[in-house]
Amino acid sequence: LQGEAKEKYRELTKNLSKLTLDFSENNLKETNNYQLTLTDEAQLAGLPESAIEAAAETAREKGVNGWVFTLHAPSYIPFMTYADNRDLRRELYMAYNTKCTHDNEYNNLEIVKKIANIHMEIAQLLGYDNYAEYTLKERMAETGDAVYKLLNQLLDAYTPVSYTHLTL
């Protein structure tokens, strides 16, 4: 790239870096702010003692009674793996998978839209029709058509096997 195009590329990548950082910071803040506080010992059914002790310690640190589970892996994974209470697992799962989508200061929707638009602008500036075409060019697939061809081959190969497993 030369001249204005080069300057535009610099501006876009600078904005992309800032937006990516903002996205990550929002994700971290939302993760840090969430807590599932349980006060009924029956709700801990199925959890290993180590997870219960860690949740009790987290509750003490936060100055609350009971047990606190967070979206951080050392708390989240044991809860999702071992907790008997399906409703509580669902609550924690939904909290984890809807981070930064709520109507609050950590919502990443606009950031994601801006990142997608910048990706498109960068791709077009470099002579590609879209960002997927740009990113695939340097990879094994090289084109979107090649990706779809591979996916269809996998589908053809694995569909009969999957039906066999369904009938078991």
Language model regions located:
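Conserved small/polar residues in nucleotide/adenosyl-binding loops
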Residues: 164-168
